[in-house]
Amino acid sequence: MTLFILTETSAGYALLKAKDKKLLKRDDLEKETQTAEGVSNLLKLKNFQKFDSATTALEEVASLVEGKVTPRLASLLESIKDEKKVSLAVADPKLGNAIGKLPGLSIQAIADSTTADLYRAIRAHLPTLIPGLLPTDMSTMALGLSHSLARHKLKFSPDKIDTMIVQAIALLDDLDKELNTYAMRVKEWYGWHFPEMAKILNDNMAYAKVVLKMGMRSNSDSADLSEILPEEIEGAVKAAANRSMGTDISNEDLENIQCLAEQVVGFAEYRQQLASYLTARMTAIAPNLTALVGELVGARLIAHAGSLVNLSKSPASTIQILGAEKALFRALKTKHDTPKYGLIYHASLIGQATGKNKGKMARVLAAKAAIGLRVDALAEWEKDADGNEPTEEERAALGMESRYYLEKKLAAMEGKPLKPRGVGIAPNGIPIEQPKKWDIKEARKHNPDADGLTGDEPAATENVSKKSKKDKKLVEEIKDEEMKDAPESEEEEEASEAEESEEEKPKKSKKKESKTSKGKDSDEAKIEELAEKAGLSVKRYLRKLERGEINFDEDGNPTAISKKELKKAKKEAKKAEKDAGKKRKRDEDEEPAESKSEKKKKKKSKA
């Protein structure tokens, strides 16, 4: 089988033919290819197709990087079409697969580790294999092609589109800070002239527009604010302007305030435009991530990771705590619990969870987001039969399904329905209330009639709600009547149940049991009498009798031992035990001493 070697250079395509068909199987291939003579003895040039210009060289190399066969390369391969049993050595496996799929060419592409040494030798001694090619020309052409290829990659790389998201979210955060600072400065500055307007208007944008439209507060009657404010608030602003307590300002002061107000209005309008641009970018680049966590949280995750591809390579555990690196390393250093969430904490699904469920939802949401990110970054969408590209809904189908699953899981964990999408959720799980509509309320007046009241007499202008609460009918509490015939103890209840169940027994057994029941009744009567004498209930009397806390006189009258007497008896018993223990120790200490003296006497007697 004839062996050909395809070599891609910065000057053009070179097709080399091996003089030995079993060149790749030789053991001494590395030794023979160390010199230019050895390489020229093993290989010879079959065909060389030169690039016409630098632009064509860039197009050819860019397509080769993607593993595509260009028409120029296909025409070069047609020169070996007539030869039988051809094998072609290729440096890139992707390119080898593409060449093997070409119609009309029965070429076996080889792209494995056996060709690495051969290609290394060809690159080192390429000028000797291609006549008319100088080493200096090769280096200059390679340098120019590498620069143009780098520019091409930076310009048209799909991975770099997410840089727009990174810059947009960073600018959005900066705009929020600047807008808040400028709006507060306008309120403080214009507040010297018209301080009441800051309490009426909560919206910074509306405040700045009113400053631009009205100017001095003396122009409030002639100024038309209907385009900016509703009728009620417009009337309140004009009424407050007529009775304002602010100081007068000069025209020069007003011009500077209005210039700052123009900046606030311009920044606010641009911020809205930037937010809509960011939403459109996120739905186009990462639709599944946007469906799961929202465009703002998704954009912050991408910006923190650096790019969409870097974020898609991260596992779910990293996505979960992304943005909480300081807390993580602090916890690892101090051997405390690691954080459960980072930037993902601001997602609406986690915001609606409460307590321990926040950590669970963060873990599940990060797992689903990791899957959606890999689809967004690495999936290749093909056109349908009609040639139409997939819609945004089709691309975001996985994210929508995952969100539906997470919403069901969260509702099951929380045991309550979720808030609709679009509702702002605070970190504590409560929806963020929008600023309420400003209403004019009458000031509370002093009630002179209430000054002369004495005691708990109500005021003349008391609220109706308070009266209604006081006028509620009281519910009478009926005390439970004590049943005279009811059994006082569990024993009596059992006896009564036994009597009811045993009515069906024969008469003889009834007579016997009636005697025993009479005996029991007489004993219970005696116990009740003794309990009354002791001044205790029957239950307490029985308990104390079991503990031995009741003494009987000579006449048989019981007396309960008090708590003080019990404490004294216990203390005396403890002292007696301690004294007995000390005596035992003394006896034990004396016994060995006596045994020693006896041993000494025995020794003396033996001697």
UniProtKB/Swiss-Prot annotation:
Please provide, alphabetically and separated by semicolons, the GO molecular function terms listed in this UniProt record.
Answer: snoRNA binding
By its UniProt entry, which Pfam families does this protein fall under?
Answer: Nop, NOP5NT
Q: Where is the Nop domain?
A: 285-415
Residue spans of biased composition, Basic and acidic residues class: 473-487, 514-532
SMART domains xref list: NOSIC
InterPro entries the UniProt entry points to: Nop56/Nop58 (IPR045056), NOP58/56_N (IPR012974), Nop_C (IPR042239), Nop_dom (IPR002687), Nop_dom_sf (IPR036070), NOSIC (IPR012976)
Ligase keyword on record? no
Q: Where is the composition biased (Basic residues)?
A: 598-607
> Does this UniProt record's set of keywords contain rRNA processing?
yes
UniProt-annotated location(s)? Nucleus, Nucleolus
Where is this chain compositionally biased, Acidic residues type? 488-503
* Family statement: Belongs to the NOP5/NOP56 family.
* PANTHER family listed in its UniProt record: NUCLEOLAR PROTEIN 5 NUCLEOLAR PROTEIN NOP5 NOP58, NUCLEOLAR PROTEIN 58
What is the designated name of this protein? Nucleolar protein 58
Q: Which organism is it from?
A: Coccidioides immitis (strain RS)
Q: What does UniProt list as this organism's lineage?
A: Eukaryota, Fungi, Dikarya, Ascomycota, Pezizomycotina
